[in-house]
From Swiss-Prot:
Involved in control of chromosome replication initiation. Inhibits the cooperative binding of DnaA to the oriC region, thus negatively regulating initiation of chromosome replication. Inhibits the ability of DnaA-ATP to form a helix on DNA; does not disassemble preformed DnaA-DNA helices. Decreases the residence time of DnaA on the chromosome at its binding sites (oriC, replication forks and promoter-binding sites). Tethers DnaA to the replication machinery via the DNA polymerase beta sliding clamp subunit (dnaN). Binds 1 zinc ion per subunit. Belongs to the YabA family. Its cofactor is Zn(2+). This is Replication initiation control protein YabA. Homotetramer. Interacts with both DnaA and DnaN, acting as a bridge between these two proteins. Zn(2+) binds at H90, C92, C106, C109. GO terms for biological process: DNA replication. One of its GO terms (cellular component) is nucleoid. It is found in: Cytoplasm, Nucleoid.
Length: 115
C-alpha cells in the first residue's frame, strides 16, 4: 500500500467517524425529546386521572369506599424533579444532583424521570 492509498483510507475513515458522531448526536437529541415528551405526557395523564377521580367521587358518592377503585397518583416529588430538570439542573443520584447541566442533556436524569 503506498502513501496515497493510506492517506485516502485514513480520510475515508475520518469521514465515517464524523458521520457516526453526527448520527449519534442526532439520535441522542431525539431520545431526549422523546423521553421529555413521555414524562410530560405521564404527568398530564396522572393529573387528568386525578381530576377524573375527583369528578367521579362527587358524582358517585353512594359507592362504598371499600369497593371504590383508586388510581395511583404520581408523587409531588416526581413533579418537582421534572420541573428542576426542565430548569436545567441535574436530578440524577450522585454527586451531580443539583448542579446545573449547562444546556446539556443527562441520560441518568432522564432515567430518573422515566421510572
Amino acid at each position: 500500500m503506498n502513501r496515497n492509498e493510506l492517506f485516502e483510507r485514513l480520510m475515508k475513515l475520518e469521514h465515517h467517524v464524523e458521520q457516526l458522531t453526527t448520527d449519534m448526536s442526532e439520535l441522542k437529541d431525539l431520545t431526549v425529546e422523546l423521553v421529555e415528551e413521555n414524562v410530560a405526557l405521564q404527568v398530564e395523564n396522572e393529573n387528568l386521572k386525578r381530576l377524573m377521580n375527583k369528578t367521579e367521587e362527587s358524582v358517585e358518592t353512594h359507592l362504598d369506599k371499600d369497593n371504590y377503585k383508586h388510581v395511583k397518583t404520581p408523587s409531588p416529588s416526581k413533579d418537582n424533579l421534572a420541573m428542576l430538570y426542565r430548569e436545567g439542573f441535574h436530578i440524577c443520584k450522585g454527586e451531580l444532583f443539583g448542579k446545573h447541566r449547562h444546556g446539556e442533556d443527562c441520560l441518568l436524569c432522564l432515567n430518573v424521570l422515566s421510572d
